[in-house]
Regions:
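A cross-taxon signal for low-complexity, glycine/charged-rich
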Residues: 1-8, 18, 373-378
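Short, low-complexity intrinsically disordered segments enriched in A/P/G/S/L with frequent Arg
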Residues: 10-12
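Aromatic (phenylalanine/tyrosine) cluster motif
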Residues: 14-16
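Membrane-embedded transmembrane alpha-helical bundles that form the catalytic cores
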Residues: 22-637
Length: 638
């Protein structure tokens, strides 16, 4: 130190100490902020902090890229840190799921007797479902108990109580908060153990490798749900990032950010949220615009998250499955669900719909689920009359199937499809709105199967009758829902008659007209079902049922009755920015797949300097649309 101070002011030695102190003054708060959980600032793809976090992860990953065991352990630890920054102490639940599913999965594989394998598989599925149901459906079951017996019990958060005692936290014990992404990683864990039981995959040998599979941070909190047979083999491959793959990854990230910020967040903060919060303050047209805008918002939000997740994973050398395939190009509700949230839809197909009998027959599981869902409906309604109505409906179905044996396969197939859709609705939340949303999607699929088998003349006549009867009922009762159904069936029969008339003159463009028409009808139907989906979202579980139902009812009322025809032009002009963003988003969505593939490859094939410049420009444009408070991704709540 003396040599260092030669020729310097006598105060110099203290200068070094002061610098060290100042450095610590900055470093300690920085580390505290970095490693502390802040519920108001979760780690999101839309935050600059996330990209700083990912830059560190990516840099370290390139240093250990060929040391597979270390890489997997590092990414597992990184994923746990990511989840901790998103959900705090709930990371312990994720760790519990990793431990439980890893060891029981190993036991399933080692069991020699089939009944032991099945018993262990059932045990692990029950464990995963109990974890999910405790956090997601506690309010629902306690409310149902009170409605039917008058016994009033309150939720108690055992995990929060244990956390307070062990770690000195101050979490509320009388409130249960849904951990982010719990529905996704529990489903992923269940599919892993079920696939081991079915002999489809081998159990993972190393718990760190399995933990990495179950918690991989890009897709942890909102999917896509990754199957072990597709992802686990990637755990043991060396890291390799070709130049074009790097370009494709950057493209997906920028594409996802543009969807989320320019489309989804802009529509939500500037119009959609305001209308859904207070629908009675807006006209029927404004409610309708908000509903259609929400259809684009939820797609841009969810597929935007998936695009970013795919891009981030690709930069680290891992491929995630496609989760969306231009769903608003679907020609029917059934096709829509093949294109929307593909990883969840295929999960329902493989682990619920097909085991129930699929399109072959009914099984004991079919009747169990129909009975269980009927019980759920009775609990939600709090009325025995709902149970009587459902009982009479199932009695009618049973008598019809008995009298017409040829129809049994059709009935059971559609019962399985309906059960799957309603369970899917209930997976999103325990309120009437999600049950109705799932039921409407199931009804749409069943109705479409019946409808397309009928002749054009029959469809023309039936659509006119449905339109006329809905219009007459609305005229007599002023019940808003009949105005909406009259409008839908009016559009339907207008289209059918237009096609019939057009065929009299030319068949040249009939296929294109048919495709455009069915895409439009499907989009309108799916958009209407979203009314019940959005109304039930982002609510306190303790009051979700009442608030969601009132929101949906008020919006239906406004859309069915609150129209001022002389002000339509003025109202539309007031919201021209929203309409233009919606139209632009839909036009981009409807661009043919081949063209999208070409400009994706063109971006990835650019020289690096040009790619950097174009990426910087895109980021600058995206930044102009960012609001002060970024909206959380919609599917975080599930």
């Amino acid at each position: 130190m003396e040599k260092l101070n030669e020729g310097l002011d006598p105060s110099t030695p203290f200068h070094f100490a002061q610098d060290d102190t100042l450095m610590l003054d900055y470093l300690i708060p920085f580390l505290t902020r970095t490693f502390a959980f802040d519920a108001n600032s979760p780690l999101l793809f839309t935050q600059f902090y996330f990209w700083g976090f990912f830059a560190v992860v990516f840099a370290f990953l390139t240093l250990i890229k060929n040391r597979i065991a270390l890489r997997n352990a590092f990414l597992f630890a990184t994923s746990l840190f990511f989840y901790y920054k998103t959900s705090g102490s709930y990371v312990c639940i994720l760790i519990f799921c990793v431990i439980a599913n890893f060891f029981i999965g190993k036991w399933i594989e080692r069991a020699e007797l089939q009944w032991k394998k099945k018993f262990l598989m059932i045990i692990v599925v029950i464990i995963d479902l109990l974890v999910l149901c405790y956090y997601k459906y506690s309010y629902f079951f306690l409310d149902a108990l009170y409605d039917f017996t008058g016994i009033e019990l309150h939720v108690y958060n055992f995990f929060a109580a244990a956390s307070n005692k062990m770690f000195g936290t101050h979490s509320l014990v009388d409130t249960i908060i849904l951990p982010v992404g719990i529905s996704f990683f529990t489903f992923q864990a269940m599919s892993y153990c079920i696939d081991i039981y079915r002999g489809k995959i081998k159990a993972v040998d190393n718990i760190l490798d399995f933990g990495f599979y179950l918690s991989f941070f890009p897709q942890l909190v909102a999917g896509p749900i990754v199957r072990a047979d597709k992802f686990v083999p990637q755990l043991y491959k060396h890291f390799f990032l070709p130049r074009r793959t790097f370009g494709i990854a950057v493209f997906w990230i920028l594409n996802g950010l543009a969807k989320k910020i320019i489309l989804s967040d802009y529509l939500a903060t500037n119009f959609v949220d305001r209308v859904f919060d207070t629908p009675l303050l807006f006209t029927g047209l404004e409610n309708l615009i908000a509903l259609f805008a929400y259809s684009l918002q939820v797609y841009a939000d969810f597929s935007g998250y998936t695009d970013i997740a795919i891009g981030v994973a690709l930069l680290m050398g891992f491929r995630l499955p496609q989760n969306f395939n231009s769903p608003y190009k679907a020609l029917s509700p059934t096709e829509f669900w093949r294109r929307w949230h593909i990883s969840l839809s295929s999960w329902w197909r493989d682990y619920l719909y097909i085991p129930l009998g699929g399109n072959r027959n009914a099984t004991l599981g079919t009747y169990f689920w129909m009975g269980f869902l009927s019980l759920v409906a009775i609990m939600l309604s709090g009325s025995v009359w709902v149970g009587i109505a459902l009982g009479l409906f199932f009695l009618y179905i049973a008598i019809y199937a008995y009298l017409k044996p040829d129809s049994r396969k059709f009935i059971t197939t559609n019962m399985n499809a309906m059960s799957t859709q309603i369970v899917g609705g209930w997976w999103h939340g325990a309120s009437w709105n999600f049950i109705i949303w799932g039921g409407l999607n199931g009804f749409g699929q069943v109705f479409n199967k019946i409808w397309v088998k009928r002749s054009r003349n029959f469809r023309a006549a039936a659509s006119f009758i449905l339109f006329a009867s809905s219009a007459i009922i609305f005229k007599q009762t002023h019940i808003a829902i009949f105005a909406i159904t009259a409008a839908y069936f009016g559009i339907l029969f207008t289209g059918i008659y237009s096609v019939l008339i057009f065929r009299l003159f030319s068949d040249k463009y009939i296929h294109g007209i048919y495709v455009a028409w069915n895409v439009s009808l499907t989009f309108i139907f799916i958009t209407f079902t979203r009314l019940f989906f959005r109304a039930g979202s982002n609510l306190d579980p303790a009051e979700a049922n009442e608030v969601a139902w009132n929101t949906a009812k008020n919006m239906v009322q406004q859309m069915g009755t609150a129209w001022k025809w002389d002000t339509i032009g003025t109202i539309a002009w007031e919201h021209i920015n929203i309409i233009l963003v919606f139209v632009a988003g839909m036009l981009i969505h409807w661009i043919p797949k081949k063209i999208k593939s070409r400009y994706r490859i063109a971006f990835a094939s650019q020289p690096i300097p040009l790619m950097v410049a174009s990426s910087a420009f895109i980021i600058f444009v995206i930044y102009q649309f960012m609001s002060a408070d970024s909206c959380p991704f919609i599917y975080f709540q599930f």
